[in-house]
Design a protein with these regions (language model features):
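Small-residue (G/A/S/T)-rich helix-start motifs and N-terminal tracts that mark the onset
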Residues: 1-116, 125-139, 148-271
Length: 271
């Protein structure tokens, strides 16, 4: 199993072209958040914008959109009740989950999706594996507990051989799997299984996964493949968390703090 490095990330990521514009870096639609988890929408949006997506549109309730707008004036918005009739022809990826709560419309969103789809947290908890489109272009980002619910395999069995179970699920359902744990396993049907050993216990807080999902979705919206987007998002998330722990400490760091260490990684490589 390949152990990922930051060199792998920057071998994948193209430099931003001098003659580019916001349309050059994709349009991400994030169906996220509910009244109880407004912060999840904010955090996933921060993760997406800080990793370079050209246009982010947050689709949610008024109270969630207000929370995101207060924090991130760069975001655009689509009321949740307008999603079914909206023109999504320019959207290059959809993120579904991240504090969405129990939303009966999730299965329909997934069924109707014609662009790359990233499913996190409640985006996964509201469906069965059979609901996942078999056409490919789907990334799922479960932690061990969510993966256990999704597969029916016990947590102890998954922990004993995460790469095996992630690969089997990936091949059976034609998806890219980001199986989150202290070491995060990434696999897809046609690519080798890899592991990211970046990250630390300072990430063991609510909200860390929301930022990761936003980062992965951002890279997918920018045109990276499912697997490459998962690799770049996961490694950068963990590596910036390690820098953050050095700067603040694992005990006191918060999930959004890691985004202020991303610039160090990019600046060191002239990006």
């Amino acid at each position: 199993m390949k152990e990922l490095t930051l060199n792998d990330v920057f071998d994948i990521l193209p430099e931003r072209a001098k003659d580019s514009n916001k349309g050059s870096y994709g349009r991400l639609l994030s169906v996220v958040g509910c009244r109880y988890y407004r912060g999840a929408a904010v955090l996933s949006s921060m993760g997406a914008l800080r990793t370079g997506v050209g246009i982010l549109t947050v689709c949610s309730t008024e109270e969630v959109m207000s929370a995101v707008a207060y924090t991130l004036p760069e975001a655009t918005f689509l009321p949740r009740d307008e999603l079914e009739t909206a023109d999504l022809s320019k959207v290059t990826a959809i993120l579904c989950g991240c504090g969405l709560g129990k939303d009966e419309g999730v299965a329909q969103i997934i069924k109707n999706c014609t662009v790359p789809l990233i499913l996190d947290a409640d985006g996964l908890n509201s469906i069965t594996p059979e609901d996942i489109p078999k056409k490919g272009n789907v990334i799922i980002t479960p932690h061990i507990g969510e993966f256990s619910r999704l597969t029916g395999i016990s947590i102890s069995d998954i922990k004993s051989c995460p790469e095996r179970y992630a690969k089997e699920f990936s091949e059976k359902y034609n998806v890219t799997v980001v199986l989150k744990d202290f070491d995060t396993v990434i696999t897809s049907p046609a690519r080798e299984t890899a592991v990211s050993r970046f990250g630390n216990p300072g990430l063991a807080r609510g909200g860390s996964g929301d930022i990761l999902a936003g980062m992965i979705a951002s890279f997918r919206a920018q045109g990276l493949s499912d697997y490459d987007a998962a690799v770049c998002g996961t490694v950068l998330h963990g590596a910036s968390a390690d820098l953050c722990a050095e700067r603040l400490s694992m005990q006191t760091m918060l999930p959004h703090d890691i985004l202020y260490d991303l610039n160090v990684i990019f600046n060191e490589r002239g990006r």
